[in-house]
Curated annotation (Swiss-Prot):
Keywords: Disulfide bond, Ion channel impairing toxin, Knottin, Neurotoxin, Presynaptic neurotoxin, Secreted, Toxin, Voltage-gated sodium channel impairing toxin. GO terms for cellular component: extracellular region; host cell presynaptic membrane. It is found in: Secreted. This is Mu-diguetoxin-Dc1b. The presence of a 'disulfide through disulfide knot' structurally defines this protein as a knottin. It comes from Diguetia canities.
Length: 58
């Protein structure tokens, strides 16, 4: 495998590739020399503002 390769449904979202709310993150992505499990995670970036992206939950 090489960096950026993914496992998951067609059209799934890669690591930090945009807002994942209501979308499907890839199951896994090859990052930093190993397979990482991805899931949509939301973080408070400012008061009353959340950003959500596909994050490494390995």
């Amino acid at each position: 495998a090489k960096d950026g390769d993914v496992k998951g449904p067609a059209g799934c979202m890669k690591y930090k590739s945009g807002d994942c709310r209501g979308k499907t993150c890839c199951d896994q992505q090859y990052l930093w020399y190993k397979w990482r499990n991805l899931a949509c995670r939301c973080f408070t970036v400012e008061v009353f503002k959340k950003d959500c992206w596909c994050n490494d939950i390995s």
